[in-house]
Amino acid sequence: MRVLVLGSGVIGTTSAYYLARAGFQVTVVDRQPAVGMETSFANAGQVSPGYASPWAAPGVPLKAIKWLLQRHSPLAIKATADIDQYLWMAQMLRNCTANRYAVNKERMVRLSEYSRDCLDELRIETGIAYEGRSLGTTQLFRTQAQLDNAAKDIAVLEQSGVPYELLDRAGIARVEPALAGVTGILSGALRLPNDQTGDCQLFTTRLAQMAVELGVEFRYGQNIERLEHAGDTVSGVWIDGVLETADRYVLALGSYSPQLLKPLGIKAPVYPLKGYSLTVPISNPAMAPTSTILDETYKVAITRFDNRIRVGGMAEIAGFDLSLNPRRRETLEMIVGDLYPQGGDLSQASFWTGLRPTTPDGTPIVGATPLRNLFLNTGHGTLGWTMACGSGRLLADLIARKRPQISAAGLDISRYGNPQENAQHVNPAPAHQ
């Protein structure tokens, strides 16, 4: 059975890999010259199931107003003429209730923890190397109020059985020695020891090589134009003026997925949240991060690779604008310079931006659609790297009609009101260990 995967970011590539392992004949098509060249290229580098939470949360609307008034704001909104921007923001606001937050977070944590386990298994089985570290994530609080508010997050962690440590200043210096000289500006920290880090683009590149060894064909530099359908079935994809056909189709085009779905009558509320990153060569390894740091004040992650520091964050609701805003670079340089003033050479840093495909409820869209042979794997927001392996494996199981290892409930597009008359509902296997 032939499967055509549209998109070769970390989501499309993991989908292709697990489909090939399941015995499918897989072809991946992308407009870029290689895998992982868009949103997967220079993200923050975190694999953080413990921090899998929707942006839509109680209190966020008020926080957003305050953020918009700050010079180094983690959020910016640029009005466009696109009605989808306003519809998406309205849907997100409707999800900022305690009940919806709890439902959405459970879905995200379920998939994220499974995905981390799949990544661990993949690393053991294949030896794939991607500058990965399994040294946890440390969330820094600059104020006592932030530290006090962490009690709500800790309650959720305890309920989910996620290990954690609450650190004082001495504890921060113990797990991140390079911060010893700046602990005076910190009130405390929350550490999740089971979180991981790694270069997402490097992982995607090497997994694609392994997929090729399994028979996957990658076709680059090809423009995906539109999907053709007849009744409840996709009959082909127009690629550079040629109609390509397969038995099953997987749409993994991130923020661009809705553009192909809309003509089919499928509404996918996936909207781009623009993020930025700075990649800094390490000048003094002893003064660089050990793993990943999250700065709660600025909503920025600072991650250690082998010889580089990746500083990533921000959220701009600005449509598909990919221009580089120098003020965002200034903010990232300020934060890394504040915490790790001797760690890296900012004069040699590279600046990047990407579009995170985000749903209003934070949960990605993974699974079947109203069209019987079309499947989606998109909308992972800031957690594409965290959720990639689990999403790819879950999707492959669903397409193969195999019993998945976790429940797929609430993950497909039917939660937005799209009918699922032809979706295959498969009971999950016993809880994944």
From Swiss-Prot:
One of its GO terms (biological process) is D-alanine catabolic process. Its cofactor is FAD. It comes from the Bacteria. Its EC number is 1.4.99.-. It is an enzyme of class 1 (oxidoreductase). FAD binds at residues 3-17. Keywords: FAD, Flavoprotein, Oxidoreductase. GO terms for molecular function: D-amino-acid dehydrogenase activity. It catalyses: a D-alpha-amino acid + A + H2O = a 2-oxocarboxylate + AH2 + NH4(+). PANTHER family: D-AMINO ACID DEHYDROGENASE, SARCOSINE DEHYDROGENASE-RELATED. This is D-amino acid dehydrogenase. It comes from Pseudomonas syringae pv. tomato (strain ATCC BAA-871 / DC3000). The lineage of its organism: Bacteria, Pseudomonadati, Pseudomonadota, Gammaproteobacteria, Pseudomonadales.
